[in-house]
């Protein structure tokens, strides 16, 4: 297993609508394993494939961070949602920034697991928020897209400067 490089906003690949996975095979399972490694190394609770420059509809989630309740969602689709909630969200692709994002309190999602078997998951609380955040990534949407243009531009400018500093070191 290998940790992958996380793309930083405003990388254009973060704005791409990802393609569905056509077949879950060993190559896809390797991607899933590498995504979990990356997510834990970066101290995240969720990761979408486009964040590591893989433009396929794959999500890994572990809101507890203990490797006991891992979720793999391949080709996820929200079937139902209800309630209103929101928390200050962060994102591995937008380091150092957080913002309040409106989300649904509960979601029902259908997806494939790491073996290609279809399942349905009812989620609420942080898990529901994380699922929505990561599905947004698969659709080329970042949490900054929920912010005002001015706030989004300020974050973009700061992260461009941050990326230049990293490139120099």
From Swiss-Prot:
Q: Which SUPFAM superfamilies match?
A: Peptide deformylase
Gene3D superfamilies this protein is in?
Peptide deformylase
Any single biological process term in GO: co-translational protein modification
A molecular function GO annotation: metal ion binding
Per the UniProt entry, the Enzyme Commission number(s) are 3.5.1.88
Q: Note how many cofactor molecules are bound and how.
A: Binds 1 Fe(2+) ion.
Query: What residues bind Fe cation, as annotated?
Result: 91, 133, 137
What reaction(s) does this enzyme catalyze? Answer: N-terminal N-formyl-L-methionyl-[peptide] + H2O = N-terminal L-methionyl-[peptide] + formate
Signal peptide feature range: none
Q: Which residues form the active site?
A: 134
Protein biosynthesis in keyword set: yes
Q: Name the InterPro entries on file.
A: Peptide_deformylase, Peptide_deformylase_sf
- Give the UniProt keywords, A-Z: Hydrolase, Iron, Metal-binding, Protein biosynthesis
Q: Which cofactors are reported in the record for this sequence?
A: Fe(2+)
Q: What does this protein do?
A: Removes the formyl group from the N-terminal Met of newly synthesized proteins. Requires at least a dipeptide for an efficient rate of reaction. N-terminal L-methionine is a prerequisite for activity but the enzyme has broad specificity at other positions.
Similarity-based family: Belongs to the polypeptide deformylase family.
PANTHER family recorded for this chain? Answer: PEPTIDE DEFORMYLASE
Q: What is this protein called?
A: Peptide deformylase
Which species is this record about?
Haemophilus influenzae (strain ATCC 51907 / DSM 11121 / KW20 / Rd)
Q: State the taxonomy lineage.
A: Bacteria, Pseudomonadati, Pseudomonadota, Gammaproteobacteria, Pasteurellales
């Amino acid at each position: 297993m290998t940790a992958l490089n996380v793309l930083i906003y405003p990388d254009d690949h973060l704005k791409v609508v990802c393609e569905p996975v056509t077949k879950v095979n060993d190559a896809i399972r390797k991607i899933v394993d590498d995504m979990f490694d990356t997510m834990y190394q970066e101290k995240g609770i969720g990761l979408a494939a486009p964040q590591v420059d893989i433009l396929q509809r794959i999500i890994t989630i572990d809101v507890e961070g203990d490797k006991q309740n891992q979720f793999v969602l391949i080709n996820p689709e929200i079937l139902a949602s209800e309630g209103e909630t929101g928390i200050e969200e962060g994102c591995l692709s937008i380091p150092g920034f957080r913002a309040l994002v409106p989300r649904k309190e509960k979601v029902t999602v259908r997806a494939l697991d790491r073996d290609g078997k279809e399942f349905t998951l009812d989620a609420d609380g942080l898990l529901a928020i994380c699922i929505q955040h990561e599905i947004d990534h698969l659709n080329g949407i970042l949490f900054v897209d929920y912010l005002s243009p001015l706030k989004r531009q300020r974050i973009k400018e700061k992260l461009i400067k941050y990326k230049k500093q990293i490139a120099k070191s």
